Amino acid sequence: MSIVEVKQNAEQKMQQSVDSFKNSLTKIRTGRANPGLLDTVHVDYYGSMVPISQVANVSLLDARTISVSPWEKGMGAKIEKAIRDSDLGLNPAAQGDLIRVPMPAMTEERRKELTKVVRAEGEHAKVAVRNLRRDANEGVKKLLKEKLVSEDDERRAQDEIQKFTDRFIAEVDKLVAGKEQDIMAV
């Protein structure tokens, strides 16, 4: 393995950690409706549990309401029950074939609780990035130990790895700040 491969591997894995964090942020409810909120809700479809998006069209009616249109007539009640039974705290209402999912207003206490969750998730993402930095630096040191690179090259590689780390940690901080702002907006 060369220094270039170690750096590319580190950057790629750091990007994956940040992408995973972005994905986990979409599951945290803000005051606004987001169709991605229902991605974690599964419904019984002929004996197997599948995401709602595989049995219905999920879209926004307005800023505070998600609409779910089942593709099969008999799925409406099952989808409504699955949303109600999920831990999202949502109360769907069926109107013919359409299921409306209004987003309840969040209390100040719930908002503060969610910002703590967002910060904790952000901290986990930063720890993951730092662990990847450590692994990459160890890989570079191993190359130095095997005399495959010079000390100058090792130092340069560690500096570049640190720049990757700083960039991804700044991105995580930016995502956390944006999500907190979304949550605290009334």
From Swiss-Prot:
<comment type="function">
    <text>Responsible for the release of ribosomes from messenger RNA at the termination of protein biosynthesis. May increase the efficiency of translation by recycling ribosomes from one round of translation to another.</text>
</comment>
<dbReference type="GO" id="GO:0005829">
    <property type="term" value="C:cytosol"/>
</dbReference>
<dbReference type="InterPro" id="IPR002661">
    <property type="entry name" value="Ribosome_recyc_fac"/>
</dbReference>
<dbReference type="GO" id="GO:0043023">
    <property type="term" value="F:ribosomal large subunit binding"/>
</dbReference>
<comment type="similarity">
    <text>Belongs to the RRF family.</text>
</comment>
<dbReference type="GO" id="GO:0002184">
    <property type="term" value="P:cytoplasmic translational termination"/>
</dbReference>
<dbReference type="InterPro" id="IPR023584">
    <property type="entry name" value="Ribosome_recyc_fac_dom"/>
</dbReference>
<keyword id="KW-0963">Cytoplasm</keyword>
<dbReference type="Pfam" id="PF01765">
    <property type="entry name" value="RRF"/>
</dbReference>
<protein>
    <recommendedName>
        <fullName>Ribosome-recycling factor</fullName>
    </recommendedName>
</protein>
<dbReference type="InterPro" id="IPR036191">
    <property type="entry name" value="RRF_sf"/>
</dbReference>
<keyword id="KW-0648">Protein biosynthesis</keyword>
